[in-house]
UniProtKB/Swiss-Prot annotation:
Belongs to the eIF-3 subunit A family. Residues 797-901 have a biased composition (Basic and acidic residues). InterPro entries: EIF3A (IPR027512), eIF3a_PCI_TPR-like (IPR054711), PCI_dom (IPR000717). Pfam families: eIF3a_PCI_TPR-like, PCI. SMART domains: PINT (SM00088). PROSITE patterns: PCI. Component of the eukaryotic translation initiation factor 3 (eIF-3) complex. RNA-binding component of the eukaryotic translation initiation factor 3 (eIF-3) complex, which is involved in protein synthesis of a specialized repertoire of mRNAs and, together with other initiation factors, stimulates binding of mRNA and methionyl-tRNAi to the 40S ribosome. The eIF-3 complex specifically targets and initiates translation of a subset of mRNAs involved in cell proliferation. GO terms for molecular function: mRNA binding; translation initiation factor activity. It comes from Aspergillus clavatus (strain ATCC 1007 / CBS 513.65 / DSM 816 / NCTC 3887 / NRRL 1 / QM 1276 / 107). The keyword Repeat does not apply. This is Eukaryotic translation initiation factor 3 subunit A. It is found in: Cytoplasm. Its main location: cytoplasm.
Length: 1044
């Protein structure tokens, strides 16, 4: 079953318009409200729902139904924020425009009612729009019949002002924390600020600021939601900064200084989040408003610091504009007059800072000081300063920047009188004209009172250094200021009491004798006895104010210090070793410091490296955590978006199916109705009342219609056949009757045609004669102009011919000139190209010549290097040969000496043979280095010579085999003693070559794979090495020996 018709937006809109037309606007609003807040509306297309919302907000404004409008707009935002954001902005703008229009109309109506009354601030007596009626106003309205302007505004204008305020608040609540509606949100906030400023709504402005502040605080809480704002985005942050600066401006205009200070804190918080620096024009407005706030709160120290920052910003802007590094849009326009004014205010505000302390009283608690310290830290951060400002620092900064030259003359004179050349007896006379000039300026008049406090403080501090007591009358005469800034005795006494209470002054007043006594007790407060010790005092710096003499308290307090200094100087003069010991101790300390500098530097560098690594690790961990969080957030957001997209697709698909089905049903119903109407009007003979309309469909209707049409066709054919037969008989009768009159008709027609021909012929001849006569007359009339025409034509032709010849000759001259110019250009181009080509060829030749020279030089250097290497190699070979010869001679001398020793031993005693116990042959120690070797041909020849001479050279003694001589070592170097003892029994063998290497035992014993034991007789040397033992042998692996 299809839904009821009033569910469709078009039907709802039509129904509401009908109700409005009959004067039932509340009923129309109820209908629209029910439709907008219905769940079925979520699937309605936005295009068809927008007109309904426009009419809905219009009725809400007319009837002042703010709550209903809020409900409907919330529902509409939820429906349209994912598909079409523009329609939300259109509806909300319409809502605000209608509310503002109603307020304007209400004001006009109130003006008409009370045309004789004028008010600069409408409804100024209504402090709170949400609490309009108070018991006093109700009683006044009851007992008083007078119609005043306030009562008229309260009755006519104030309700619409309240509704407009609720409109702004509702729109801001709807648009909050939505990135797609952020621009509209900021625009609405600016409109709300203008509303508060235009109608002087201070209470609503406070609530608006708190509302915006809560929205920003909740932005981080709802950052995971879809379309949440991101304060890390530079554009978003810049829009919030613009809104907060406008909030600051409105707060200052309304003189709501507390809200202005909170706006300053909001701006500072947003600036700390910003990655890009703020514009200079915005920061100039920031410091200017901050200076006004500090002046109102009588915080003159930070007021002067704000002026100092403002002046620095103006200097930077002027320098940037002069250097062309900035634009006028980003930097405030600065003139010399602006710089002079700013410099004057910087200096004047610094002079107005109280000299004595205003921070605490003498008995203040520590927690109070801590709170004030925290407050000063906050204010310092707001100014963007590294440390808290002070009076001395501000003056030093002003002097370094040359503010005295830029300031106005009276301000410069005031600085010289107060800070440079202060004289208590003539201070008031000197400063009177300056105070008059300052008091004449409305902007500088606010500094007169703090300047009086500074002057009185300096006056009493200077008098306390000179006098012990003075008359009150003398004080009153010194403290004389010009009118209207005159200081009364009561004000002076109040100032003295406040200074004594805070511990800055130590003064007693005796009203009986009229004397003012300065306290000289040496045990009194050090703060009172040391002028200028207060924070921010100009006298805290040495030499800022002339000190006349020390007070008794200072003399008593500094007695030990003076004694220590005197004793130190005396020791230096009396005992020279005292200075030497100090110098030595100083040098020792310096030496220790120098010795530990490197180590401390290395430790510092190591700590810095460790700290950097820890910072990098912490940063990496934080970045990784942030990336993971961003990834999770992105995945979650993507999942939500995909789920929302899928839900919207499903809803869209269902709506489309439903729409198609409804459209098909509607078309089917319309088709049935149309066919029924056609049956009623077109086809006769059908009684529709007998048909069941519920059971009808298109096919049955079509069959009924076709049957009826067939029936009508048959009836029509019968009628046509009967009519044709009747017409045939009539036509035959008509033709028989016509045959009688055909001849007569022919003659009459021919006579008529001849008459028409004669008339046409006569008319044609007449027209031809008239035309011929006119042409002949025209010819005779124009024949007189032919000679004149011919002459004129001839003259024009000759002039044209002469002009043509001139132009042709000029063209030929131009052509020849351009041709010659072109020839010169071509020749010059070819000459230039030829010169460039020759220069290029010359450059290539020079390049090739340079490359060839470089190659030759490289080859020469290579040849020289090879020659030097060859010479060095030859020198090394010669040195090696010399060393080999020296080693060989040394070895020969050692062998000869060994042979001589062996011969001497053999001549003295001959040891018995040791055949039974052969000595163990130890491996040869390769002590003698290999110095020079022979080639493989020489070694081969030596082997062959040794093999042939072995049988002949060996003696043939008859000895048993078991008593064969022990094997001799074939290598040179160290010879064991048992081998030396047997040298006398036989001839000494030839010295082995010095180049023979160490040979292992298992390779020396070639006859057996087992090493010789102690009970076996070692084989003879000839049997061990048949090829001679003089040549070096090559090492052969074990596996290869076994294979052989």
């Amino acid at each position: 079953m299809p839904p009821p018709p009033h569910i469709k937006p078009e039907n709802v809109l039509k129904r509401a318009q009908e109700l409005i037309a009959v004067g039932q606007a509340p009923a129309a609003l109820n209908v629209l409200h029910e439709h907008v807040t219905s769940k079925r509306t979520r699937s309605t297309p936005i295009v068809s729902l927008e007109p309904v919302m426009l009419l809905f907000v219009e009725l809400c404004v007319d009837l002042r139904k703010g709550k209903a409008a809020k409900d409907g707009l919330y529902q509409y935002k939820n429906i349209a924020q994912n598909t079409n954001v523009g329609t939300i902005e259109v509806v909300l703008k319409k809502f605000i425009e209608l509310a503002e229009k109603k307020v304007t109309e209400a004001q006009a109506k109130a003006d008409e009612i009370q045309s004789s009354l004028e008010s600069a601030a409408p409804s100024s007596n209504v402090e709170d729009l949400e609490a309009i009626e108070t018991p006093e106003t109700i009683l006044l309205a009851t007992v008083s019949g007078e119609q005043s302007r306030d009562r008229t505004d309260r009755a006519v204008v104030t309700p619409w002002l309240k509704f407009l305020w609720e409109t702004y608040r509702t729109v801001l609540e709807i648009l909050k924390n939505n990135a797609r509606l952020e621009v509209m949100y900021q625009t609405t906030a600016l409109q709300a600020f203008q509303f508060c400023l235009k109608y002087t709504r201070k209470t609503e402005f406070r609530r608006l600021c708190e509302l915006l502040r809560n929205h920003v605080q909740n932005a981080a809480k709802y950052s995971a939601q879809m379309h949440a704002i991101n304060l890390s985005d530079p554009d978003t942050l810049q829009r919030h900064l613009d809104t907060r600066f406008q909030q600051l401006n409105v707060a200052v205009e309304l003189e709501l200084w507390q809200e202005a200070f909170r706006s300053i804190e909001d701006i500072h918080t947003l600036l700390s989040l910003s990655k890009r620096p703020a514009k200079n024009v915005m920061m100039a407005n920031y410091y200017e408003k901050l200076a006004r706030i500090f002046l109102v709160s009588e915080n003159y120290l930070f007021h002067a610091a704000a002026w100092n920052r403002y002046y620095n910003l103006l200097r930077q802007s002027a320098a940037a504009l002069a250097a062309g590094q900035g634009t006028k849009k980003e930097n405030p326009s600065v003139t010399d007059a602006d710089m002079t004014k700013a410099a004057s205010f910087v200096l004047l505000s610094a002079l107005s800072i109280p000299v004595i302390s205003t921070s605490r009283s003498r008995g203040a608690l520590v927690d109070v000081d801590e709170v004030r310290k925290n407050k000063n830290t906050r204010l310092t951060n707001l100014l963007g300063m590294a440390q808290a400002p002070s009076r001395a620092v501000l003056f030093r900064d002003a002097l370094n920047k040359g503010l005295l030259k830029r300031a106005r003359p009276e301000i410069r004179d005031l600085y010289n009188i107060l800070e440079v050349d202060f004289h208590p007896l003539s201070i008031c006379k000197k400063i009177t004209p300056i105070l008059k000039q300052i008091g004449a300026d409305p902007e500088m008049e606010k500094y007169v009172l703090p300047l009086q406090q500074v002057i009185l403080t300096r006056l009493f501090q200077q008098l306390s250094q000179v006098y012990e007591s003075v008359e009150l009358k003398f004080i009153y005469e010194l403290a004389q200021f010009p009118e209207p800034f005159q200081v009364t005795p009561a004000m002076i006494e109040k100032f003295i009491m406040n200074g004594c209470k805070k511990g800055d002054l130590a003064i007693r007043v005796d009203h009986i004798s009229g004397v003012l006594t300065f306290d000289t007790d040496i045990f009194s407060s050090a703060k009172a006895l040391h002028p200028g010790s207060a924070a921010g005092s100009a006298e805290s710096e040495a030499g800022s104010v002339q000190r006349l003499q020390n007070t008794p308290a200072e003399i008593a307090r500094l007695q030990l210090t003076r004694l220590a200094k005197t004793l130190h100087v005396t020791c230096m003069y009396v005992d020279p070793s005292y200075s030497e010991v100090r110098i030595q101790a100083k040098q020792a300390a310096q030496a220790r410091a120098a010795a530990g500098v490197a180590k401390e530097h290395e430790e510092t560098l190591a700590r810095r490296v460790i700290i950097d690594k820890k910072k990098e690790a912490a940063t990496d961990a934080l970045q990784r955590k942030q990336r993971e969080e961003e990834t999770r957030k992105r995945i979650r957001t993507q999942q939500l978006q995909e789920a929302e997209k899928q839900r919207l697709l499903d809803e869209q698909r269902e709506r489309e199916k439903k729409r198609i089905k409804d459209e098909q049903d509607r078309i089917r119903q319309q088709e049935l109705k149309k066919q029924l109407e056609e049956l009623k009007s077109g086809v006769k003979g059908i009684d529709i009342s007998e048909l069941d309309l519920e059971d009808l469909d298109a096919n049955r209707l079509r069959a009924i219609k076709l049957a009826q049409l067939e029936k009508e066709k048959n009836e029509l054919n019968d009628k046509i056949r009967t009519t044709a037969k009747r017409i045939d008989h009539l036509e035959r009768a008509f033709r028989r009757e016509e045959l009688k009159h055909i001849a007569e008709d022919y003659e009459a027609q021919k006579q008529h045609d001849m008459e028409v021909y004669e008339a046409t012929k006569a008319e044609t001849l007449k027209e031809a004669k008239e035309k011929h006569a006119e042409a002949v007359a025209l010819k005779h009339r124009l024949s007189r102009l032919v000679p004149v025409y011919s002459n004129f034509r001839k003259e024009v032709s000759e002039k044209r011919h002469e002009e043509f010849e001139k132009r042709r000759k000029a063209a030929e001259r131009d052509f020849e000139a351009k041709k010659k110019q072109r020839i010169r250009e071509v020749q010059e181009r070819r000459r230039r190209e030829r010169a460039e080509r020759e220069a290029e060829e010359q450059r290539q030749k020079e390049e090739e010549e340079r490359a060839r020279r470089e190659e030759e030089e490289r080859v020469a250097r290579e040849e020289e290097r090879r020659r030097v290497l060859t010479e060095e190699k030859a020198k090394r070979e010669e040195e090696r040969k010399k060393l080999d010869e020296i080693a060989l001679k040394q070895k020969q001398r050692e062998e000869e000496a060994e042979a001589r020793r062996a011969a001497r031993k053999a001549g003295v005693t001959e040891p018995p043979p040791r055949a039974a116990e052969p000595e163990r042959t130890a491996p040869r120690l390769n002590i003698a280095p290999r110095t020079g070797g022979s080639s493989w041909r020489e070694r081969q020849a030596a082997k062959e010579a040794a093999g042939g001479a072995a049988p002949a050279a060996a003696p043939a003694p008859e000895a048993p085999k078991e008593e064969a001589q022990p094997p001799r070592r074939t290598g040179g170097g160290y010879v064991p003693p048992h081998l030396r003892s047997g040298a006398g029994a036989s001839a000494a063998p030839a010295a082995p070559p010095a180049t023979e290497k160490y040979v292992p035992r298992h390779m020396r014993d070639s006859s057996s794979s087992q090493p010789p034991s102690r009970t076996q007789t070692p084989p003879a040397p000839a049997a061990e090495k048949p090829e001679g033992s003089g040549a070096p042998q090559k090492w052969v692996p074990r596996w290869k020996q076994q294979q052989s």
